[in-house]
Regions:
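A cross-kingdom feature marking solvent-exposed beta-strand/loop segments within repeated
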Residues: 1-3, 64-74, 101-103
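Flexible coil segments in periplasmic/lumen-exposed cytochrome c-class electron-transfer proteins
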Residues: 1-52, 94, 98-148
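Sequence/structural segment immediately N-terminal to covalent heme-attachment motifs in c-type
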Residues: 34-63, 70, 75-88
Length: 148
């Protein structure tokens, strides 16, 4: 946004106002809470691989490390973005307010499909997040998209 002209920002605002409103009701509580073994495995992986940057409470350390607690992109109906971030990692662009962004490392070479599903499920339901659980069967299709 820092490189947009005022006219571009106004055009974007006008466009966004034309989009239909989303349902404001929270998603139903995830059934993952009923699967203690998945949640425990996901919590252990989170504690060892994610908590250093994103915090034990999921609040992160902005702007370098974004919060996962209450993060709408984590609780979207589709878990694709969350799975891909765990597999591929991610690197934010440098901006005026964040000139040296930190990146998230990929975990595709460390975690198997069950572990990816467990940690993503944990993140999607921990800290009162309201995302749905992720099945290990959802991971291989996205793993195939990894660059060689």
């Amino acid at each position: 946004l820092q490189y947009m002209t005022d006219a571009d920002a106004e055009a974007m605002a006008v466009y966004l106002k034309t989009l239909p409103k989303r349902d404001a009701d929270p998603l139903p509580t995830s059934q993952a809470r009923l699967q203690p073994s998945v949640m425990e495995n996901g919590r252990k992986i989170y504690d060892t691989q994610c908590a250093l940057c994103h915090g034990a409470d999921g609040k992160g350390h902005p702007p370098a490390y974004p919060p996962l607690a209450g993060n709408q992109s984590i609780t979207m109906a589709s878990p694709v973005n969350s799975i891909r971030m765990v597999l591929n990692g991610g690197y934010a662009p440098g901006t005026k307010k964040n000139p040296r962004p930190h990146g998230m490392p990929p975990f595709s070479h460390i975690l198997d499909d069950d572990e990816v599903a467990a940690v993503v499920t944990y993140i999607r339901v921990a800290w009162d997040n309201s995302g749905a659980p992720v099945a290990a069967a959802q991971v291989p299709e996205l793993r195939k998209l990894l660059p060689e």
